[in-house]
Amino acid sequence: MSFAATHNLDGRTLTVDELWAISAPGEKVAVTPEGWARIKASYKAPIDAATDGRDIYGLTVNYGALKDQKVAGASVEAEPNRSASIKFNERQMRIQAAGLEPYFDDRISKMAMVIRLNQMAAGYTGMSEAAANAFQEYINNDVCPLIPSRGSEGANDLSMATHIGLALMGEWDVSYQGKRVPAAQVRKQLKLQPYHPFGMDGISILSNSNVAEAQSIAAVKKAEHYLALSPVDIASSLEALNGNVSPFLWHTVETKGWPQGHEAAEAVLANLKGSYLWKKDAKRYLQDPLSFRSAGYILAAAMEELNQTKGLLNTAINHTTDNPIVNTEAKNDRWYSNAEVLDEMRAGKPTVYVNSCSNFDNTQLALQMESLTKALGQVMHISAWRTTQLVDDHRTGLPTYLVAKENKGSDGFANIVLTAELTLFFTAPLFGPLTTLTAT
């Protein structure tokens, strides 16, 4: 039996593993008092900067090539500017929302909302308390906006995250209790107060990488599952081949010294406790094919890439991909801190900044995900090679496809071998250059 839990979001300590747990149905979140304080301070910064006469991207001026176009006056919170800001934000949600099915899984949708709420608690977004409450209500009631998985406009997934904003406004469909339901209907059923995106809410909802980060985390959890099974696969293959434990022993791996080498090798050996492979056998080959001998190091490479990817994502979900960014706890101890140009970026206090940036650039995450993908490709590739080796009667001394001679007309495990061979043939180009593991 499992029990739902409430997880605290402070904008500082959320991890990939905790986020994945939160994405399960029934799990709830609560912003810490420190998080709420940062949300309030972050919201105030761009409002104050606009009041001082600064043009704030997405708040007082339009987006992109239209950034010279005014959308609200300096006193943004006062009418008619407040209504103009809400109208602008709502219009942008409707303009940007486009995409094609299939829709993302509910867990990805929920993670995307949790990431955004946690980043609000970090104090980097400039979003309102009303926005934070709206996100929290959907998360805690498992109301998951339908997000098309195809049709992103490019940098920062503008079209994807916009569907979350539309659903918060009650203008799109959500997944609720296993069904596709109009958001307006669910909001009425749950008696939620109307939400109108004001100020920085609009640009901060639609222009961020939270959906991409949620996708990446879902992929990482799959990779984690596959790699957890890999030591069992390697160990069982060694047993089937009457293979050597030599490449996996501590004093062997120690001479290589690469990251995760010992962890991978020990994971394999743990599955060989009590195995006949620990006994002498005159029939055992001196060394095994590379797909067996190198399996530990290739698994180690994938484990290291997984760790690197999780580390980068742990950083990402506690920071932000917004433009502009708000930082209410900025340091002023740099050599350039007293430069005149920085005065134009400060919002009242010396430690409060609203800066134009390109935090939406995800080159590092994209490259890291590619590295993880290639590493998983290596693991899959040699697993397929091991399968082909295990039905080679010259290697094992067993009948072809494990079909007994008297069993006429049977194909035995032929389909498994064919699947492995097709895997080798069709998937190798997907992962880029693979190590030179031939059929040895």
Residue positions per predicted region:
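N- or domain-start disorder-to-order transition segments that initiate the globular core
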Residues: M1-G53
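Generic secondary-structure signature for well-ordered alpha-helical cores
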Residues: A24, K28, A97, E137-C144, ...
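Short, hydrophobic/aliphatic alpha-helical segments
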Residues: G35-D55, A134-S149, L192-Y195, R346-V354
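Glycine-rich loop at the start of a catalytic domain that most often binds anionic cofactors/ligands
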Residues: A65-I86
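Active-site cavity-forming subdomains of large catalytic enzyme subunits
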Residues: A97-T255
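Accessory "access/gating" subregions that flank catalytic or transport cores
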Residues: L238-H381
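C-terminal catalytic subdomain
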Residues: D361-T440
